[in-house]
């Protein structure tokens, strides 16, 4: 099992030190949250059924944050968890995420999702009702630019002729897809991994079964490219070794660790966060 450290709601002044400490302690990577601007009074419901934050919560830009963290580390991997692509347009995502991948020496996977905060998507000038269909097209566009440098696309939501974007990555940039709907699982199966978040223990095997069926269908259609397929899950349970061993036996490759109480005054200091990381590492690494 690979352990990613959850980094969200933190003070910007601590982020680089958190990255250094996470690498020293032995985390595999860091997962960074994504929101641009949170409208007050939003009515959208988070998939957990709870309101996870207030509009004034700290959300530094994830790609900028990852680039800075990568510059002060050498082994740590990085992941937006998850980057809400449909509240943006695909060209800037391809340029920015591709650049982060290259400058981090490919210690980066683009974790994407359709998003749940419809008011934020609309605020940024995008249609929340088409976010899933647009995400499907966006991921094809990203792959075209990253793999070939010059691409064209003719879809329902994006339509453009031959267009170039250089420099292009000279290694494969993984795309991991979040969500538990049937559409999200199909989307994940077509790419490089699946990101699951806060699912009950009795729900996880069902979702994994659906994912494996979709993945088999994709491989039967286009063959196996030999690249690893990541399955990252956060179970809605207190973590322990036996639980993680069971998840690993079911095909889960990674999980995200919350090493301190997010946003809690008791964890505000960098020393408290480092102590939380060390305690988690002692228990699980």
Each predicted region: which residue ranges?
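Active-site-adjacent structural elements that line small-molecule/cofactor binding pockets in enzymes
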Residues: 1-285
């Amino acid at each position: 099992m690979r352990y990613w450290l959850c980094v969200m709601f933190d003070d910007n002044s601590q982020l680089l030190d958190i990255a250094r400490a996470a690498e020293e302690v032995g985390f595999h990577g860091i997962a960074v949250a994504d929101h641009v601007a949170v409208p007050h009074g939003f009515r959208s419901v988070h998939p957990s059924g709870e309101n996870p934050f207030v509009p004034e919560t700290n959300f530094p830009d994830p790609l900028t944050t990852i680039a800075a963290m990568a510059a002060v580390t050498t082994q740590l991997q990085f992941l937006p968890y998850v980057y809400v692509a449909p509240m943006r347009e695909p060209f800037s995502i391809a340029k920015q995420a591709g650049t982060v991948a290259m400058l981090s020496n490919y210690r980066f996977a683009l974790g994407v999702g359709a998003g749940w905060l419809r008011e934020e998507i609309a605020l940024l000038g995008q249609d929340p009702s088409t976010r899933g269909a647009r995400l499907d097209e966006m991921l094809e566009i990203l792959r075209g630019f990253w793999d070939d440098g010059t691409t064209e696309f003719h879809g329902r939501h994006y339509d453009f002729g031959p267009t170039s974007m250089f420099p292009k990555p000279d290694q494969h940039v993984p795309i991991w897809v979040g969500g538990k709907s049937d559409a999200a699982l199909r989307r994940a199966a077509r790419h490089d991994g699946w990101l699951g978040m806060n699912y009950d223990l009795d729900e996880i095997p069902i979702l994994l079964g659906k994912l494996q069926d979709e993945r088999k269908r994709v491989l039967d259609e286009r063959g196996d490219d030999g690249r690893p397929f990541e399955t990252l899950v956060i179970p809605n349970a207190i973590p322990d070794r036996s639980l993680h061993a069971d998840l690993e036996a079911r095909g889960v490759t990674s999980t995200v660790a919350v090493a301190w109480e997010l946003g809690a005054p008791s964890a505000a200091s960098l020393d408290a966060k480092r102590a939380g990381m060390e305690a988690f590492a002692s228990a699980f690494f």
